[in-house]
Regions:
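Motif-centric detector for short Cys/His coordination patterns
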Residues: 1-147
Length: 147
């Protein structure tokens, strides 16, 4: 996957960013989960939230003081998840935990590389819907075999 690059952004208080990507595509991303996380508390202030700018070279979004920011790949992944075009990382990690799978065993179960599982597990790349389907299928078969 190529690194995503941001061209412009528009903020919408309290938590939405409309992102125009260098590719010409547009995404609306709700960053509520960031705003409610430690280190991002300043984003709750409307004036601070609307001070967002595109980082140099389009690698992310940063706010007025330069100490708060979100990288482009995370925004891209989050936008895909919110649009229903990617399997949410929280659901993928819950599947791994529920089935007591390590990174290597999850990779083996899904027929993908361990490195890919690391990217998915850490939220570094959007997780394709077919991986969600594979997780559901694997879990269904595992339950049937256990019965």
């Amino acid at each position: 996957m190529n690194q995503q690059m941001i061209k412009t952004i528009i903020t919408e208080v309290p938590s939405k960013l409309t992102i125009l990507w260098q590719s010409g595509k547009q995404t609306i991303v709700d960053i509520s989960e960031y705003i409610n996380s430690p280190g991002y508390e300043k984003l709750k202030e409307p004036k601070f939230f609307t001070s967002a700018i595109v980082e140099e070279w389009g690698h992310g979004v940063e706010w007025a003081d330069g100490e708060v920011g979100i990288d482009a790949d995370s925004l891209y992944r989050l936008g895909k998840e919110q649009a229903g075009l990617a399997f949410p990382v929280t659901d993928f990690n819950a599947w791994m935990e529920r089935n007591r799978l390590s990174l290597a065993s999850a990779a083996n179960a899904l027929g993908i590389t361990r490195r890919t599982v690391v990217y998915y597990h850490g939220g570094h790349k959007p997780i394709p819907i077919y991986i969600k389907l594979a997780c559901i299928g694997w879990e269904t078969l595992a339950y049937q075999q256990a019965a």
